[in-house]
Amino acid sequence: MRKILLTSILILSMNNITFANNEYSNSEYQNLLNNYIGEMRNETDIFGGSIYKALYKGLDEGYIIPNVNRIEILSDSCKGIADNMKDIKIKDNNIQVKHNELVNKYYEVHQALEVLLQSRKEVIYTNKSTANKLIKLIVIDHTTGYRANKKIEELNNIYKDINKSLN
């Protein structure tokens, strides 16, 4: 009976140790983060051009027959990566703070892209003339598109800062 009790306590304590130690080390976190970013880049790489590049340099989808699929894919991808990363715990508190900031920024980028997407869809699906649509889409890209680009730039800076801290 005594051996069974000691064995049970030992097994329970070993399980508690393994479950309590679910925080990532810096190198494990760096590998995980780079895997998520790599998967996102693969998802958003359409026709050989990165959407990040397209958004950073300006939305280049054309104004006469604009395509919102690229923005939808990037928006969904940002939300997906934020959802996957939100519960990650890291042993280093400074990296944890930066990680939380990164996840929050992904949600902000997702929201900015959703606003851009909705405003572009409203213009595209109206019955106005092509010239009016063109003017409205240019205005949207210079306001809402610019805000989305700034959020993406901030997101990239946080990612670079985390990678510098991990090396």
Which residues does each predicted region cover?
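Classical Sec-dependent N-terminal signal peptides that target proteins to the secretory pathway
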Residues: 1-22
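Generic hydrophobic/packing signal
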Residues: 15-18, 80, 105, 116, ...
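C-terminal amphipathic alpha-helix
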Residues: 22-68, 111-167
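Short, solvent-exposed, charged loop/turn and helix-capping segments
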Residues: 72-106, 120-122, 158, 163-166
